Every structure is written in structure tokens, then in C-alpha cells.
């Protein structure tokens, strides 16, 4: 049985802010990874070149445009504070990334949403932590997409000024 002292950790209160969050999945990653380890496809080099081409800062840090990018295995996660980054900047960023990965033969499918977020980059504790409502929604949207596409959450479509950024595809909005 836990003591009151042990359970006191649950009294900690955090300040959550709304963030845009994109979850992108590299399609066919397992095959590309197998070729990489056979020295037949430079997966690492192609990912690096696509990231540089799109102007992405590859490490979790404050960036000039306010968008933080994390990449691991076949997943790319982008976050941006809603109060500081306009949704169209985020959409353009994802579009650039998607195009550059496509040039490398690495096709992306994903989702973009918004929600509360807490992140600790691990500077003090030595490990990082990310909890995001928007990430969960973006991941769920990605799993429902059939083809390489970036699905945009219906809840944020009304915040988009440039109607050419997204198009309606069936019952979903997708990045154009």
C-alpha cells in the first residue's frame, strides 16, 4: 500500500498550453531499413537530406519559426505553440517536409491536430518526456488514412485563412 508521502506526487500541478501537433509516419520503413542495413539504400543520408532541404531543425530545441521537430524510427513529430505559430506556418512546414521526403522516395502519411501539451526535454533529469492530446489525435488520424496523405483535424480547419492549404477528401480535410 502506497504511503501519503509516495502519493503526494499526484498533487503536482502543471500549466498546460495548446500546441499544434503533427504525427508523420514513413511508409515502407521496414523495407527501407532492411536495405539500409544491407548498405543498398542510405536511409540515414536520405532522411538527413530531406530534413535539410525542408529547412528543419533536427533536434528538440527552440527554433526561429517556433516549430520543434523530433524524428525516431519511422515517426516524425512536430509541435508548435498555438499562441505563437499560425496554423498556416505549421501546414507549410509539414508540406515542405512531405515534399522533400517524397523526393527521397520516402512517403509520409500523418495527421495534424491541436491540444494540451507538456514536454520536458530532459535537461535536468537526463530523459525527455512528451504528453500531448494533439499527438494522440494526430496519430489516430494517421492510422485511419489509407494513402500517403496528411489529414487535418476538422477542429483546426476554421483557423486556416488560405483555403488552398487544405482540401476536402470524402469526410476528411487533407493537406493540399
Task: Name these PLM-found stretches.
Residues 80-176:
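Catalytic beta-strand-to-alpha-helix segment of the class III nucleotidyl cyclase homology domain
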Residues 2-96, 103:
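Catalytic NTP-binding/metal-coordinating core of nucleotidyl cyclase/transferase enzymes
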